[in-house]
Every structure is written in C-alpha cells, then in structure tokens.
C-alpha cells in the first residue's frame, strides 16, 4: 500500500508547501514517499544551495592556475612542473554538536574522500573550530570530543593535521562549528570528475556496506536546532577510518587504469545525491537497481538505502567491459563492490527494487532546476548603535601587563598546543613548519622527489566578531589575514576555498550578512588574485532562535618556492632587530581586548587598505625569500602586544632542552593614541618581524621599494617582554598564562563533567 503524502509528511521532510507544489508541477502527479525523500534531500540547503547560489555566482572562480573550479568534489590548481593540488573545506557542524566524536571524525572522512575522488593523494589537513563560552557546561565536552574525533580519524588515515584555528564565543553555545580542510597532490593531467558519461556504462558501488546511519543527515543540516536536538543522534554517521584507508588506496590504484569514467563520494544524501549529481553533470539519465546494493542491515527499504549516509562509500561509472578490472582491484583491498546501475540517455533518474520502479524522476528538477531564492535582506538593526559606540569613553587599565596576561589566557588567543598535540602532524614528515605558526608549510619532496624545491603554504581563518559588526569588511579581513599568514612563511597566495557558516537565511538580517560577506570575499579575492575554487555553505546554525556570529571561514593555499626559504613565527636569536611592517592606529573596534576587558563587542572593525596590505605582504614575502628575516608573525587577535608576547615564546624546543622555551625583547613603541589601544588594537596590515642587525638596512630598502612603512621597535634578548613606558613582564609568566588557556577550560569543566555530556 502506497503511503499517502500529507502536509505533515511534507513538513517532516523539510519542504515548504510551495516547494511541494513545485514538485507536483514537475511530476504532474503525487510523488511516492521515496520520491519525496529524494526531493527532500536534493532540495535541502545542504545539497541545493537554494538560498546562497545566486550570491555565490558572483565569486571570481577562474585564473591562470585554476584547473577545476567550483561544482566538483574539490577545486584543483596548477602548481607547475606537471603537478596540481586538489583542496576543499567543508562543514560538519550539526552532526558534531549532536555527537562530537563521530560528527567530527566523519567530517574529516568526508573531506578526505572529496579530495581523493579527484585523483589526488591527500597530504595535509587543517581545521577551523568554533565553540561556545568557555564557562558553558557543554563547551569542554564538545571541545574534547571534536578534537578526539578529528585526531582519531586523521591519524588512522596517515594524513597529518598541520594547522588550523580554534576560537570561543557565546554565540556558538548551541552550535559548534567544525570546518575541515584537506589538500592532496595529483598529476595536472589526470583529474577525475564526478560525471556519469557514456550511455550504457555500468554504475558501480565501491566501499563499505550500507546501513541505516545518517538517514536524512542533509535535511538535518538544513534546519535549526531546538529542544529535540538529542533525538537526532541517529542521523549522525559512524566512521571507520581503516575502511577509508582501504578505499583511498583502491581508488588511487583504479586511477592508474583506464577503467574509471567518473567517480563521486557518497556524502550528504548518500547514494541519492551522488547518482543524481553525476547524472546532472553528464547530461544523462541513470538507472539504479537497489537490490544490488551491499547492505549491512536486514529489512532496509528503498527509501533507507537511497538516503543512508553510511560512510566510506564511492559511486563509480566504469568503462563498459572494465567491470572485472574494477572488481579485482576492490576485492584485493577487501572492499565491497557491485554493479548497481547503468548510464542511460533518458534524462531520468530511476530506482528499481525487486523488479518494480520505486522512483522515476527527471534529473533537471533535482539539480539545476532546484529552487533558487532571492531572499529578503536588511542590515542588522543593532548595528547603528554598535557603530556609534566610542571606545574613548572606557577607562584605561591601571596595569597593562596584567591586561596582557589576561588576554593571553583567553582560549581564543591562548596556545593551541593541547589541540595539535592530539593530531599526528609528523606522519610522513611533510611539515616544513610545525603547527602553531601563522601558516602551515608542507613539503612536496616526500611524495614527489623531483619537486623537492616546492612547498605549499596553508592558512585558515576568520574573525566572526568583525563579520557581525561589518560583514563586508570582516570578510575582506578574513581573506587578507590568510594571505598575510602565507606571506609570513614566504608564500605566494594562489587560490582559496571557503566554508560559509551562518544562521537562518529566512531572517532578512542573516541573509544580508551572508550576501555582504560573499561580496567582501569576492572583492578581496579579486584584489589578491586568489580565485575561489571550491567551498561549502552551512546555514541554519541556530538553536532556539539564537544564531551564531557570521563565520565565513577562508582557507587559502599558497606556493612556497624554494621551500627551504621559509620563516618561523617566533624570535630566534638575541640581538636581532625587532620591527613592525605596517603602522600604529590603535583601532580597537570589535577587538578581543574590548570584549575581554570591557565586555563590549562594538565599534567598527579596523579599516583595510588593500593596496597597503599588498605592500606589507610583498615586503615580507620578498624578505623571507631573500633570507633576511629570522621571524615573521602576523598581528591579529590581541594586537601588537600579543604578537610580541607570542614571538617571545618559541614553539619548537629541542628535545634535550638545550634552548630555553622563550626569549625576551625590549621595545619602544610610539603611542599616537591611548597606550592600551595601540598595544591591543587589531589594526590591519601589520607583520612583526625580527632580523639580524646586518640585514636591517637592506630590509628597510626593500620595504621602501614595495611601499610599506617600517617602524623599528627594539631588539630581541633577555627574559622579559619590556615595552618602554607601558609594561615589563617575565616571559616565563607570559608563557604560563598563554599555555594554560585551553587546559583551564577543561579543568573548569571537570567539576561538573556529568552535566556536560548527554544523559
């Protein structure tokens, strides 16, 4: 008996009444429940980008290095000499809040599959994480679970996690963010795509068996959380990194043959989205025979088989006659493999079950014909009052040294050593710069000896507070800071991926934030010549109507050549000159200092002059490549004082302890405005450098050639951070505060750990 489609069933599938009406018009009949499930996931925000697509089309997506832009599993850029890099960043926010370990682990697994599906071997991962107020009872539970999940999956896969960022803010109390980034290397002339080409070609299932885990995960990721959130735990997928490792090696072996026509990861919406998207890209139809799908649970229905998000699975279109070759390779790696369908010329997507057609749908309405909304937009009503705030009315701290210590202990600024110590960042020895610096640097020599001179710089970041106060400017800052981080290691930025995390797009102020952030990213990318080659949108990050800060995370890739000429982010030698490339404005709007010391999140983000920004970056990049610098460190959260303190604390200490873990400096800073504003303001376009005295004159000449201002501040040495007329604090004391920030969050939670975990 066919189940009747009622308004309640439509609503349970996350579809609006007008969307259901569109389905009726497309089909000319009432859909079956299975067909409704297919429309539900394919028209979800997660799969269709129905609220965001009209804005995303404004991104710059092409350039001389772009081999594959948005629309595939990952973007691909040319690294020269026949080599290419595939990379992407994607969110796993909703699952990670419900079940932090598995949510984060399967997020890593999914992004790894997106990259190796392109034909690339993954060589490095990063992540950008957001958690709630450090004192919130659930924060430590989520932090520990997410970090363990990322480490557990990535370490088993043998892919090092080489960097990332972690920040805390009360807006994430009900919605943590887990944005995972992976990069892989492949021959520039052997890119594989998710296309169902060649009528008559077999469609093959490869990987783990299908179970009931993750059903309607894509729909869950397209809705707000409420009091029933815990009931959604069954929609979180369960990962098996050992199975994924086998799948990775099998796919890379298959790519060495002529058997693969197209291949797609079964990610969000599982078999449904992978098969529909492949048919859409190929301009063809597809017939699936669901009784051929390898199952791990008895009694599964066609609906469950199609919408399951079981992990570690691939859908592959093979060249006709190559089925046995595919089968032999997959069985060698102990993977399930089966022919489950055929490419057709019908333009229709059909699912068969035990001799009956259980779904028969035109492909176009599921892909390009999905709804596209121009949602209403209006600036956030709170902004005029926030912009009118005058920080000059605030009292100046009586003890600037104590204020610096408090900032260093803030979990957003504090050392992330507790986090990256749980990741295997040394596996395969790819890192040229250890975690904790401004950007990660990955050597290509490990996998590609002839490219030993090349390295890749990787950076992720965004300041959500800036993006709330001015979405356009805040998003530009995100791109600029990633590029600045890459300049600090001598890299040339070449392209970005993004992960756009926002609240409910049906609220005009949220849609305005989204559109303005997209505009800001686009304009900044045009200025830096860094096209957007891949990305992800995560909407409905709200709980009980409370949304997150707009968080458009940017992941940037740069080329470091030669890789031997890179740079550390911390001071290296006593007697070195300390200088600031950039200027001192004392802009504290939206700063960590304003929030930490005065409880204010107001004002305007610092002004950003892109010409000045590019001049600062070019100065430092050329200086690193010329071997002039001992260290280079971006000034960001916490401002110049925090950058000085962090530069005093060496991140890499010899195992024998022969070098102390810190070194001091003495500087004299000109104070054009209040001292606390100059010390802790987060002015844009600034890099703190140290260099041998004999290189100082050449460095100043180089800065003048590039058009960047340089302020000589002082010298490295001693065991204190001394800022003349402002503060003098032992570096050991600074290090203690900085290194204890994250462990303090976990200790604070220990007393009420039972309240943090679900019952």
From Swiss-Prot:
Mg(2+) 1 binds at residues 90, 536. SUPFAM superfamilies: PurM C-terminal domain-like, PurM N-terminal domain-like. Substrate binds at residues 91-94, 113, 237, 309-311, 538. One of its GO terms (molecular function) is ATP binding. Its main location: cytoplasm. Belongs to the FGAMS family. This is Phosphoribosylformylglycinamidine synthase subunit PurL. It comes from Anaeromyxobacter dehalogenans (strain 2CP-C).
